[in-house]
A protein has these predicted regions:
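Conserved alpha-helical scaffold segments that buttress catalytic/binding sites
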Residues: 2-232
């Protein structure tokens, strides 16, 4: 694997930490099944560029928190043409990062990348809980003839038997998605966007306590979720 220099990578760090806590940023600008506007392939580059304007000093902890972990940023790879092949490619990259005892932080790209990431984790942990912050359920079994479409991302994650999902902010889904959701009460819990004022975060904590958990954050959820999560 090839890495960017600390100054050109995520956050533009002035120096490397000597901490044993290791994080690896994986830029993966996938754009294969977008159904509205294009440009997801430029996401990782834009995030990394914007991150260079972030203050490194943490005003809550009153310290340079970035020194508490070693952060590497992978050099972007050439993504394979077929969607399924691209997901296998990403799964392989995440697996190599996990084998280096690093925590992977993946920047997309359209959100069909999720099952590729989860495949790598599912092989290394007995059970995983995904925290999904999203406006869409993404539980379709396929969309526009594509099984691995962005609209099917969470459905494909549930193809792995050791995966559970806790979702926040969902406000868009079709009837087939809702029918499927009703069949998996032990594997998925949705905190609906319409019920945001009544969300019980103690219930949420119980759902993920003592579990291996990963987060999937989709920007279209932020308008309805961000303030509520911050206040909680």
């Amino acid at each position: 694997m090839t890495f960017l220099s600390p100054l050109s990578g995520f956050l533009g760090l002035p120096k490397k930490s000597k901490s044993k806590n290791q994080v690896c940023v994986i830029p993966f600008g996938l754009e294969k099944s977008v159904s509205y506007e294009s440009g997801t392939k430029n996401g990782p580059k834009a995030i990394i560029k914007a991150s260079h304007q972030v203050e490194l000093f943490d005003e809550e902890l009153l310290q340079d928190s970035y020194l508490n972990f070693q952060l590497d940023t992978l050099k972007p790879v050439k993504i394979k043409k077929k969607l399924n092949d691209a997901l296998e490619q990403l799964s392989g990259i995440v697996t190599r990062v996990l084998n280096r005892n690093q925590f992977p932080l993946i920047f997309g790209g359209e959100h069909s990348i999720t099952p590729g990431i989860i495949k790598a984790f599912s092989k290394q942990y007995k059970k995983i809980t995904i925290l999904q912050i999203d406006a869409h359920a993404d539980l379709r079994d396929g969309y526009d003839g594509e099984k691995y479409s962005h609209a099917s991302a969470m459905r494909r994650c549930l193809d792995f038997p050791n995966i559970e999902i806790v979702s926040f902010g969902i406000r868009n889904l079709c009837s087939d998605e809702y029918k499927y959701y009703q069949t998996i009460p032990k594997r998925m819990k949705i905190f609906w966007g319409k019920d945001m004022k009544n969300w019980n975060f103690n219930h949420f904590k119980k759902l993920i306590k003592n579990k291996n958990a990963g987060m999937r954050l989709i920007h279209d959820a932020l308008s309805s979720v961000a303030n509520r999560v911050r206040l909680a």
